[in-house]
């Protein structure tokens, strides 16, 4: 039947390398069992080897390259934002020099004069249209009034 020493409570799945039940063998990164017969466990993070030094150097180089790239990207973003701000300032800026004031006042006068001319042309064209309508009405009235006047004279 069941083996007396193999209860579910007493047997627990764990790491075969270090014996720690908190993780499985493929997840073991921190500890190594020095002697499989004894319960002595060695912390890998406290030990150093030549391979790890080389790996650390490579990691440091890679991290430095990544930091440089990130810094360059940030600088580019800052420059672009500064350029945008400069463009906005140029658009908003109004110049206060006397020559530009004269130019702007001349331009304003010219625009005002153009608007007045357009208004005059529109009003003239409207007047012309009204005159034509009035002439047509007068002609109709003359034609209609002449027979009426003749009718009154006949009676």
Curated annotation (Swiss-Prot):
Where are the Phosphothreonine residues found in this chain?
A: 146
Q: Which GO terms describe its biological process?
A: mRNA processing; RNA splicing
The UniProt regions of compositional bias labelled Basic residues, in chain numbering, are 85-94, 107-142
- GO molecular function: any one? nucleic acid binding
Positions of post-translational Phosphoserine modification: 52, 96-97
Q: Where is this region: Disordered?
A: 44-155
Zinc-finger recorded as keyword: yes
> Any idea what job this protein has?
Possible splicing regulator involved in the control of cellular survival.
This chain belongs to the protein called: Protein SREK1IP1
Q: Which organism is it from?
A: Homo sapiens (Human)
């Amino acid at each position: 039947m069941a083996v007396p020493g193999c209860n579910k409570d007493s047997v627990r799945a764990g790491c075969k390398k270090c014996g720690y039940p908190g993780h499985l063998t493929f997840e073991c990164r921190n500890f190594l069992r020095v002697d499989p017969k004894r319960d002595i466990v060695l912390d890998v993070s406290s030990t150093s080897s030549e391979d790890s030094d080389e790996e650390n150097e490579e990691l440091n180089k890679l991290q430095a390259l990544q930091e440089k790239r990130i810094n360059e990207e940030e600088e580019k973003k800052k420059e672009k934002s500064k350029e945008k701000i400069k463009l906005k300032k140029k658009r908003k800026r109004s110049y206060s020099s006397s020559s530009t004031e004269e130019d702007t006042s001349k331009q304003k006068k010219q625009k005002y004069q153009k608007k007045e001319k357009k208004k005059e042309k529109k009003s003239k064209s409207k007047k012309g249209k009204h005159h034509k309508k009035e002439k047509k009405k007068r002609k109709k009235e003359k034609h209609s009034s002449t027979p009426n006047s003749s009718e009154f004279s006949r009676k």
